Amino acid sequence: MTRFISAVALAALGLATISGCSISVDGDEKESVTRQFGNDYVGIGGMVNLTDPVAGDAFLAAGQISIASEVQGDLVAAGGEVSIGGSVGDDLYAAGGDVQLDAMVTGNARIAGGDVQVGPATVIAGAVSLTGGRITFDGNSHGYLQASGASVNLNGQVHGDAEVRAEDLVIGPETRIGGRLVYHGPTAPVVPEGAVIAGGVEFHESEASRFLDNEGGPVAETVRWVGAVLWFVGVFVAATLFLMIFPGL
C-alpha cells in the first residue's frame, strides 16, 4: 500500500502542475485496466464491471460502470453510465451522465449527474446529497436528504429532514418524510393523498431560471462537483499508470 500512496502523491503533483497533459491508451474502446493495491481496487477503461467483493476502497472511471458486489470501504465512481448495486460499507461518491443506484450504503451518499435515479431497493444509513438535471428518489434514507435539480421526483422514505431546490417538484403518494420538507422553487408543491410529511412543508419561492443557468444553481454545482470527482479519480488513474509503467516504484 505504501507504493500506491507514493504513486498517488506523484500523480496528484503531476495533475496539479501540468494542466495541459493528457494520457491515452490505444486499443478497444471497451478495454479496461484493473489493479488491486492491498485491499483497494482501481478500475479504468471503456467499460468496468465490478462483480467480485472489495475489502477496501474502490475507485472506478469508465464510459460504462456496473457494480454488483460488496465494497467494504468507500466507493468513488465516475463515468458516462454508472449503475451501482450490491453494497457500500462506507461512503459513496458517484458522478456521471446517467447514474442508477440500487444498493445498501452504510455511510453517506453523494451523487451528481444528468439523470440520477435512486431505486426502491436502495437503503442509505447516512445523509444523501443528489444534484443533477433530473432526479428520482424512490429509496430509503435514514438521514437527511438534499436534492438540487431541474426536476425532482420524490416517492421514497426519508427518516430525517429533506431539502429540495428545483424548477419542478413532484411528490409521490408513497413519500414518507419523518421531518420537514423545505422546498425552494417557483410554485408551492402539491402533497398527494397517501404521502406523509411529519414536519410539514416549508416553501420558499425562487425563480425557475436560477435552477438552469445561475452560478449557484444545481447545473453549475453539478459541473463543479463532477469536475472535482473526476480530478480525484484522475489521481488514482494516474497512480495506476505510474505503477504499471514503473513497477519497481
Where are these regions (language model features)?
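Intrinsically disordered, low-complexity terminal regions
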Residues: M1-L249
